[in-house]
């Protein structure tokens, strides 16, 4: 070795010389074994390497890391979450992302002092970057991945919050089985409808729905169109006559509600779960295309079947859009609630509210106001004050809302059957009036935290409507299922179920029922944290819905009698406007004329789909015996309010830009900005809700989804970019 080269080393010339020597050595070594195919592979690899290491890619990534992240002692970020941030950055800037290992080298180039730790329980631990935090000015900001989050956890000792900072991945639901569909033996079938054909159709339809669910979990949304087309246009000829039966149409509606509920729970298990923008866009695109796919698949099928399929699919699409909008509202509220400075100012403004005047105005608007209502308002005021004083996380506020609805609506309505709608209306009137008066009082007094309260008020109102609608839809599902099973003694009883929304049932003689008559809803407990008092569990509370319009979203055609028309030839409100063919008449359905155009190749194969029932089948409807006493609620999907009243689903309705700015008020003197130094929260990958774990058994409106082949799936892929990391799919959530 020449020592002259080491006295004054020239790094560029030395590295180029070493690289040239290595290349020559490799060429000499493999020159005799090089084939045409190998040369082609080498060229392809060289092109890929050149594309991955463009001159502008690494500098741009380093600049992006410098703008969005900083060194912070005591802060851990999951390696998968940071890589998902990087994939989102590459997609927005139209650059080719590198693999996870290469990205780790780029991170260490920007932050050399960064370390890696494996955190988590045994068998479920994940790698984390230790010593790096997200800047508050970053679009990926989350309080738990920032310096403030680390300081807040160390000071308060609430480390249980950090346990929930794992991003959700629909891939973790791979292998989910649908609950059992209705059993044909529990249905009241007309004599003209063969039981064997109905049972066969239910089996076929369950296989079809299970395939759709598995396809959605794998993020292959485009395959849903193929499954819909092949099932409905490949229907065996002997099954075509039963499709126009009102009983089969109702069965399809109930099964669709189960499927849509399962898909909604897989894509967005809770509105508090943080979702990236890429996943939100994929969900919205799927919701938009579903109706178009059904129009093609249901071509030339009976009109009543088409109507119920279209209606349920459109409502399901609205559900997905509503959930994404409410999810965004919750993430914006999370940023406000987790800021100590903002909550301190909110507490000060909250205690300056004229509670006595607001309470009097609220009671004046109520139909039957009593002293119990006044005590209830004061109690709720004190509970919210305690949450602000303790600087509780957003999960505690959601749990408080769950407890409030349970105490003021569920328990009160349980004392009197059929009074849920009246009790919910009474409580919703009081809740809305009180919240509006509080916002008005803060506006008149130019409260510095008015913007924060306005955002929290919007989120609270949406979530309360969400809970009340879920309760109402559960009650309507019970009534509909009783009608399908024929538990009503006469046709008039079944018609009364259909007309419930148009004509409310006549209450029994006596004073109107209200929350004031429940001692549990007005009794003021001793001072304690509202979080420490768990709300009693009840089935199907915190799922989905809103109590603005009391029309149930699953509208079915219910037979009043075997082949008998409605009395006086009047059309029922929830019935289809088109003529319904009699189930006793055998009719032919035209052959699908666009098979080649849409790529239809053959009939639907029902036998190739295995592992449908790894466990013995059990009746999923134990709460529906043949007697009139119903011991429990049915498990069906709740739905949401209309988009006309809460138009939060458009891209222009994002809350941060308009609320997170310091705007001048009518007050003549300078006022402190509403949300000082609070970044946007449009992308958050952490903090699933606490209450979802607590109410896991009671929130589902049907039997919880089971899992199959646990050993074959990795259920802890806690990030939506599983397709990029695992390499199991060609497209992913970040696409």
Swiss-Prot record:
Family, per the entry? Belongs to the RFX family.
InterPro entries, alphabetized: DNA-bd_RFX, RFX-like, WH-like_DNA-bd_sf, WH_DNA-bd_sf
Per UniProt, what is one Pfam family of this protein? BCD_RFX
One GO cellular-component annotation of the UniProt record comes to:
nucleus
Q: What does gene deletion cause?
A: Mice with an insertion of a cardiac-specific epoxygenase transgene into an intron in the Rfx4 locus develop head swelling and rapid neurological decline in young adulthood, and have marked hydrocephalus of the lateral and third ventricles. Interruption of two alleles results in profound failure of dorsal midline brain structure formation and perinatal death. Interruption of a single allele prevents formation of the subcommissural organ, a structure important for cerebrospinal fluid flow through the aqueduct of Sylvius and results in congenital hydrocephalus.
Q: What is its main location?
A: nucleus
DNA-binding region in chain numbering: 44-126, 61-136
User: Where does the record say this protein resides?
Assistant: Nucleus
- What protein is this chain from? Transcription factor RFX4
For bias type Polar residues, the affected ranges are 32-41
Q: Which SUPFAM superfamilies match?
A: Winged helix' DNA-binding domain
Tissues and organs where the protein is expressed, per its UniProt entry: Isoform 1: Brain-specific. Isoform 2: Testis-specific. Isoform 1: Highly expressed in the suprachiasmatic nucleus, the central pacemaker site of the circadian clock (at protein level).
For the region Disordered, give the residue spans. 27-59, 501-538
Tell me where the signal peptide lies. Answer: none
Q: Which organism is it from?
A: Mus musculus (Mouse)
Stretches for region Necessary for dimerization: 315-487
Instruction: Give the record's subunit note.
Output: Homodimer. Heterodimer with RFX2 and RFX3. Binds DNA. Interacts with GPS2.
Query: What is this protein's gene name?
Result: Rfx4
Q: Which UniProt keywords apply?
A: Activator, DNA-binding, Nucleus, Transcription, Transcription regulation
